[in-house]
C-alpha cells in the first residue's frame, strides 16, 4: 500500500529517516501534492538534525525515541538526554502544531500530539537506557511498534510487548 509507507532508523539511520521525510515533504510541496510519499517516520537515538531547517519540510507523522542516558547527549543543546525540555524535542512537537497555537515549553513524554490524518502527529519517548541498547530494548521496541500501529491504524493480535526476537538473537548468534 503506497499510501502507508513508513521509515525508521537508529542513530545515523534515524538521521536518514528524518532527512527522507524532509526530502519527500519538500518534493510533495514542489509538485503541489498534499501528501509526502513517507506517511510516517520514527527516529531512534538521533536528535541533532531535528532543526527547523529540516522539520519545516516534513509532511509526515514523526515519532522520536531518545535514550535518557545517551552517551552522546553532550552534543545536544542542553547537554543532556532529558527530552521534556530539549529544544530538539520541542521543535518536533511544535512543528506539528497549528501556527496560531502557542509553542509548547515542555513535552509530555509518550503523548501523541497532532493529527494522524493531517500527518502532523508527533510523539517523543525518552526511555531510561543507553544509546546502544535502544534497538535491543523491549520498551523502546514496543514504543516503536505502538507508533506504527497507531499511525497506520493497524490492530495486531499481538501486544507490542509480546516480543520473542531477543531469544532469537541470544540463541542463534
What label would you give each PLM region?
Residues 1-162:
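Soluble extramembrane regions of membrane proteins in the secretory/endomembrane system
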Residues 163-167:
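Individual transmembrane alpha-helix segments
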Residues 172-173:
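Conserved small/polar residues in nucleotide/adenosyl-binding loops
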Amino acid at each position: 500500500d503506497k499510501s502507508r509507507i513508513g521509515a525508521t532508523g537508529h542513530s545515523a539511520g534515524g538521521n536518514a529517516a528524518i532527512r527522507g521525510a524532509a526530502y519527500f515533504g519538500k518534493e510533495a510541496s514542489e509538485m503541489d501534492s498534499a501528501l509526502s510519499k513517507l506517511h510516517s517516520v520514527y527516529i531512534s537515538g538521533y536528535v541533532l538534525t531535528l532543526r527547523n531547517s529540516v522539520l519545516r519540510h516534513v509532511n509526515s507523522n514523526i515519532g522520536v525515541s531518545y535514550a535518557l542516558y545517551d552517551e552522546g547527549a553532550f552534543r545536544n543543546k542542553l547537554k543532556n538526554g532529558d527530552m521534556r525540555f530539549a529544544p530538539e524535542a520541542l521543535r518536533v512537537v511544535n512543528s506539528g502544531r497549528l501556527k496560531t497555537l502557542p509553542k509548547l515549553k515542555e513535552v509530555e513524554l509518550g503523548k501523541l500530539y497532532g493529527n494522524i490524518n493531517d500527518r502532523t502527529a508527533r510523539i517523543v519517548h525518552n526511555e531510561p537506557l543507553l544509546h546502544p541498547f535502544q534497538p535491543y530494548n523491549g520498551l523502546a521496541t514496543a514504543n516503536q511498534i505502538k507508533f506504527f500501529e497507531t499511525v497506520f491504524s493497524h490492530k495486531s493480535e499481538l501486544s507490542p510487548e509480546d516480543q520473542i526476537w531477543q531469544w532469537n538473537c541470544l540463541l542463534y548468534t
